[in-house]
């Protein structure tokens, strides 16, 4: 069951009454619009599919139906707070989201003050959970991801890096700086150029000209899906032949459509999941069937049935809340769900799911993929210690 709320609907942000009847509400706090809308909706698809697989849960011997309450945080920090307040007022018992660390950070205090736990799927900036006992996440963090990509770049023979990031974007600046710091510490490696651009900027010629002049082996450009297609094309049109790498947000086929398949050949990224993982075969088969059986879902997934990592994370975030609810004793409150989440441990489709003292997932490995012939090709796993295991 899915219910949609809209930012702007009057809301004080006050918690609704305690759970009544046989329905529990889980909030979906994701961007449906704005620069992160495409990725956000892929994460939503994972949660929607999870709700189809497990539409109810038994708590204290009573079965409850799960209703998803969706809001659009618009990829905007101000709108995110309003969206979070609307979820609180709707009576959700827990929240999933968000794709985009900035909006997650912005809304974090709203959920904390209302004592409603949130489980992020792909919000990787450390600030999301830091100091907030009500925020959890099922993904790895940017310090880990930045180090992983620096290790991969070094393993690929790249010794000079140009780093380009978006001003004011917590994800982009955070991941860029973690990559730069890790890369500069590696033997024979140096960051030869650092550039920044503003939100909604579309002309990157000045930045790319300066980056090209520094003669890098690799450009590391953590950005939104929208920006990625533009900047890759402009870089290749300018004659930049260096490797191009980024983080998890770039696992979206729209990028290749917008930049041109030939321009994206060899672009590398880190991500959380590979659909060819045999341990997740049941999920992959079921999710593909869901996409192919629902025209709207297939369209939101870019009109293909490739399983995005963020969809798998959205699925795992939902299942983490279900596992927590199973272990609630006494009244079903946000505080009780939070306490149960802290000790959750189960096998998710993206790996084993458990949380450390900060609410962060215990993850030690990233999947490396490259864009090749218009598709994402899994090439191996990378750890922060430099260990790279090629795909079989």
What name fits each language-model region?
Residues 19-20, 27-48, 71-77, 100-102, ...:
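Extracytoplasmic "Venus flytrap"
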Residues 1-25, 56-60, 89, 384-392:
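Short, low-complexity disordered leader/linker segments with a strong preference
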Residues 28-30, 87-101, 119-121, 162-165, ...:
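Periplasmic-binding protein-like
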Residues 11-19, 38-45, 57-129, 138, ...:
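Beta-alpha junction/loop-to-helix N-cap segments that form part of ligand/metal-binding clefts
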Residues 135-199, 218:
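An alpha-beta-alpha
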